[in-house]
Amino acid sequence: AKSSVERLILGGDFLSDARRKLLEETWNAKVYNSFGMSEVFGPIGNECTQQAGFHYPDKDLYIEVVSPETGEPVPKGEVGVGVYTTLWEKGFPLLRYWSGDLIRIIQEPCLCGSDLPRFEYFGRMTDCVKLANGTWISPKQVEEYTLSAGILHCQVQLHKDGSACLVYDEAGVKPAEQLFQQLKELLSCDEVTGQ
């Protein structure tokens, strides 16, 4: 039977394109993501019909993106830690609140036509790994590849020798070599194996 659900609005965790696709196919409904923080009393960013980043009210919220190491602003369009300042007059103001979230401000205008700025969310710093080349990798990025290969639950182990191992427990799933190549490029590894 067809579900009467037309749309799902999610929040509380990152949403990869692969997970969005899986949910949309399962529910036969559009999936939208919302971004919030209890420190700011709820949602601060929402996806529009384009599903291409979180629009946020820049008259109420000022967002800086800074280097996790130095606290200095990163170049426009680059990933860093979101630092939030609320601009409303009443209540509990936040001044340069260091969130621990890795984000980037999207520079291009949204196809929906809104003038509100947007940001992309990559995950919590504590969930991400900084590679030897300085690149931050989030679970969202790994999940794009693993979910597409039919792997719902996995762990990626990075080794000091420049290799990585994808540990998964999916009966009957044998990842294609393409998955290992994609992870090798993403993780800047010499070799990726599975078990």
List each language-model region with its residue ranges.
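Active-site glycine/GP-rich loop and adjacent strand/helix microenvironment
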Residues: 1-195
